[in-house]
Amino acid sequence: MWNDPDVDWSQAGTVVVRSVRDYAAQREEFRAWARSIPRILNQAQVMDWNSDKHYLRELEARGLPVIPTVWLEPEQNLTKHQLHTRFPAYGDFVVKPAISSGGRGTGRYTAIDPNSRGEAIRHAMSELENGRPVMVQRYLDQIDRSGETSLIYLNGLASYQVEKDPMLHPSFRSTEEFHEEVVRSDATNSQEWRWGEQIREIVHGYIVDTCGRDELLLYNRVDIVRGGPKDAHEFYVLEVSLIDGSLYLSQNPTHLKKFADAIAMRVHW
């Protein structure tokens, strides 16, 4: 465990961060721990930025197509009525904390169902009252039809991709840190890799501007969904995972080998 007091992290040549599903609940402690490690992958400053989903707003400002999001902040002191007016008027939508891991605190609701809408208001209010920013996004219907795609980059290079079944079924509510994702395929799609390259370039551009230098990411998982026929974009970015996102290492023997090779390359850099 990253917060185990009996571990002397100074003795580690390189620390690779993977299973830290509780970091969001102890974010400040995790940030301090990461900064204390001499050689950590991914880099502490990069994980710091990625630990708050407001990064999506920053990437959107740089031209990435992100699902339109309403950001709710604790300091706004919003009433239940004000929350109601900020939710979509039709269709399904998603409410989740801006600082979370493994989908915890995520709920899917139906705009025109009074009971569901009321539950969404209570959900958002609970998060805000506990000092946690909230994001509200319309649920894209094409996710139910086509699922999601995860593109995995290792040491900055396109490595493999997986196609996943939708996780947020109607009335989905999450209070757990981990939810099993159903992978339907690991076939490669050249179009999605072209989109992924656009995302990778923008992410690295932001890292350069933020850190003052480029940082080669050991791992980078980009989650995308294809746009629908009436959407303004061909694809949308759901998330960029640089901390503890699943890399689907058990889905294909080559995935684990590629990740091990990537680590070995960095250790002997």
Predicted regions and their residues:
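Short catalytic/ligand-binding loop motif for oxyanion handling, primarily in non-cytosolic enzymes
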Residues: Y23-A25, G102-G105, D144-R145, Y160-V162, ...
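Anionic group-transfer/hydrolysis microenvironments
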Residues: V20, A98, Y139-L140, I152, ...
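Conserved strand-to-helix beginnings and helix N-cap segments that scaffold or border functional pockets
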Residues: R27-E28, D52-K53, E148, N252-P253
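Active-site nucleotide/adenylate-binding loops and adjacent lid/helix of ATP-dependent enzymes
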Residues: A34-P38, Q45-S146, S190-W193
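ATP-binding N-terminal substructure of ATP-dependent carboxylate-amine bond-forming enzymes
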Residues: M1-R39, V46, L78-T79
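ATP-dependent carboxylate activation and anion-phosphoryl transfer catalytic cores
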Residues: L157, F172, Q191-W269
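Conserved residues at the C-terminal ends of beta-strands
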Residues: R18, L72, K164
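Phosphate-binding site of ATP-dependent enzymes
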Residues: A111-D209, V225-R226, F235-Y236
